[in-house]
């Protein structure tokens, strides 16, 4: 009888310990309640700016503050770049650079005949042709409109690279063998023209 009482006493003790308000699982819940009191972290966390050591209560506020430092650094770079003449050239090419001088002298590892056209501004009287094929013959852009609008266009003749003046370009546009590819954005509507981008070798 005493043995059964001691077993009951042990079970009741361990049972209470498991359901005690200070058990391990309840301590975690209590700790979580302490960390997030009324939806806010407690104690409040602070985020420190690495440049000026100013502290912020949220990561979003720190991010907005870092944008100010980015603008300041950009201004500093712009002010320093004209004063220093021996700075290395940037890795990005200048979009306003004229490539016509580079196109006239081929690189050492390529053959003299290059398939790339000379990139000239629209006012330039000369054009170099490459191998480009087929715009739809249903084009609403007539040769007269192409000459009137001062759009930059590549004039292509089958396989032969030639140079034209702007007067010759209008004459050649009337020829069925020449295809004009307008380089202006938004000039070709998908519903009006269909561009064939298939690569072909030799003459078609």
UniProtKB/Swiss-Prot annotation:
Residues 78-115 are annotated as: Disordered. Residues 153-204 are annotated as: Leucine-zipper-like. A motif (EAR-like (transcriptional repression)) lies at residues 195-199. Pfam families: zf-C2H2_6. PROSITE patterns: ZINC_FINGER_C2H2_1, ZINC_FINGER_C2H2_2. One of its GO terms (molecular function) is zinc ion binding. This is Transcriptional regulator SUPERMAN. It comes from Arabidopsis thaliana.
């Amino acid at each position: 009888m005493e043995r059964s009482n001691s077993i009951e006493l042990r079970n009741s003790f361990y049972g209470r310990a498991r359901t005690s308000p200070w058990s391990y699982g309840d301590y975690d819940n209590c700790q979580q309640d302490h960390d997030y009191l009324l939806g806010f972290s407690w104690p409040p966390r602070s985020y420190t700016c690495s440049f000026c050591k100013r502290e912020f209560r949220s990561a979003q506020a720190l991010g907005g503050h870092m944008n100010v430092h980015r603008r300041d650094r950009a201004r500093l770079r712009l002010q320093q770049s004209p004063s220093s003449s021996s700075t290395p050239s940037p890795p990005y090419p200048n979009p306003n650079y004229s490539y016509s001088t580079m196109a006239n002298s081929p690189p050492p590892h390529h053959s003299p005949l290059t398939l790339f056209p000379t990139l000239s501004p629209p006012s330039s009287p000369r054009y170099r042709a490459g191998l480009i094929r087929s715009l739809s013959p249903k084009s609403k852009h007539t040769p007269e409109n192409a000459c009137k609008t001062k759009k930059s266009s590549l004039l292509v003749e089958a396989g032969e690279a030639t140079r034209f003046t702007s007067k010759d370009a209008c004459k050649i546009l009337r020829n069925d063998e020449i295809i004009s590819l307008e380089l202006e954005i938004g000039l070709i509507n998908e519903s009006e023209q269909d561009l064939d981008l298939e690569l072909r070798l030799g003459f078609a």
